[in-house]
Amino acid sequence: MAKTATSMALAIVLTAALASTAPAAIRIAKIRYDSPGADTGSNASLNAEWITIRNTGSSARRLNGWRVRDRAGNVYRFGSLLLPAGHTAKLHTGSGPNYPPHHLYWSSSHYAWNNVRDRATLRNAKGNVVDRCAYNSTSANTKVC
């Protein structure tokens, strides 16, 4: 009986450990940190800079209260967003009409992502880091995470 209880306890611990190391279903997929052409500061130029968040899981996920942050401390907080399984939400830096879950707008009047080096951090509603994506490049304008 003691051997069975020990085996069950070990199985529970191993299952919990595997679950805690499983990759998150919500991930940063890509960052376009340098909009094409000159950085004019126009809304069109700002909106050509974006980050995509992908639901890699098998069910829809609510992102209410989740946050994206750059290294400088610019923060976007997701409102009431349901991201279907397998779908991507593109968060544009500038202003525009939100079409959740596909296109969201930060409504910033300045560029969020540094053209040379930056890091995006995705946090859930509890403030836990879910994913990070960093880049250090002058030869490309997009980072696949």
Residue spans for each PLM region:
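Acidic glycine-/aspartate-rich tracts in secreted/extracellular proteins
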Residues: T56-S59, G94-N98, A125-V129
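Short Gly/aromatic-enriched secondary-structure transition segments
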Residues: N64-D70
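Hydrophobic beta-strand signal
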Residues: T52, R69, K90-H92
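Short amphipathic beta-strand/extended segments with alternating polar/hydrophobic composition
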Residues: Y76-L81, N128-S139
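Intrinsically disordered, low-complexity Pro/Gly/Ser/Thr-rich segments with frequent PxxP/GP/PP motifs
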Residues: G73-S108
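Extracytosolic low-complexity repeat regions of secreted or lipid-anchored proteins
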Residues: P100-A134
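A structural motif detector for short, solvent-exposed N-terminal "entry" segments of globular domains
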Residues: A2-A9, A16, S20-N64, S109-N115, ...
